[in-house]
């Protein structure tokens, strides 16, 4: 029988719960995710220095790392439907602003890094906004109000820029 797996921002069933394999999957996911971001940053530097080919290779490798991370995340049962993903994202953002960044800020202050503590708190405030945004979007999905509203709105096509004024988008 599968056990319930609880990671920050996701609660799903997984056959790996409580095993070293689960820890390995979490480490692999984190490592590939970090590598992707790192290579994206490196690409930006290479491009600014005029090394277009090196920048392109960093970006290509970053895309490879993204796919590796996705593979491990799927094994950890981390991808659901849009409503589940919004709920998981909101939970993760909540943890970040209520616990993680505040704890980091307190530690930074205690260790004599007040400027870093202020940055942690600033990012925590941004994470709070992210949680609110995800919860609002989740409400819209659950209320079936993504493409229709009870009052008149301005809708803009994200592809061609067409403007529609009304209670529903032209999709």
Regions flagged by a language model, labelled:
Residues 2-171:
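Non-heme di-metal
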């Amino acid at each position: 029988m599968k056990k319930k797996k609880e990671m920050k921002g996701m609660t799903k069933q997984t056959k790996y719960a409580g095993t070293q394999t689960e820890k390995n999957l979490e480490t692999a996911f984190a490592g590939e995710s970090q590598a992707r971001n790192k290579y994206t940053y490196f690409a930006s530097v290479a491009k600014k220095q005029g090394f277009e080919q090196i920048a392109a290779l960093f970006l290509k490798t970053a895309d490879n790392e993204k796919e590796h991370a996705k593979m491990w995340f799927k094994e950890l049962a981390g991808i659901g439907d849009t409503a589940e993903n919004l709920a998981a994202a909101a939970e993760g953002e909540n943890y970040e602003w209520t616990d993680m960044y505040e704890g980091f800020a307190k530690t930074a202050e205690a260790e004599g890094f007040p400027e870093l503590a202020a940055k942690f708190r600033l990012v925590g405030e941004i994470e709070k906004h992210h949680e609110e945004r995800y919860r609002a979007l989740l409400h819209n999905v659950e209320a079936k109000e993504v493409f229709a509203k009870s009052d008149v709105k301005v809708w803009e096509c994200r592809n061609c820029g067409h403007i529609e004024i009304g209670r529903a988008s032209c999709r």
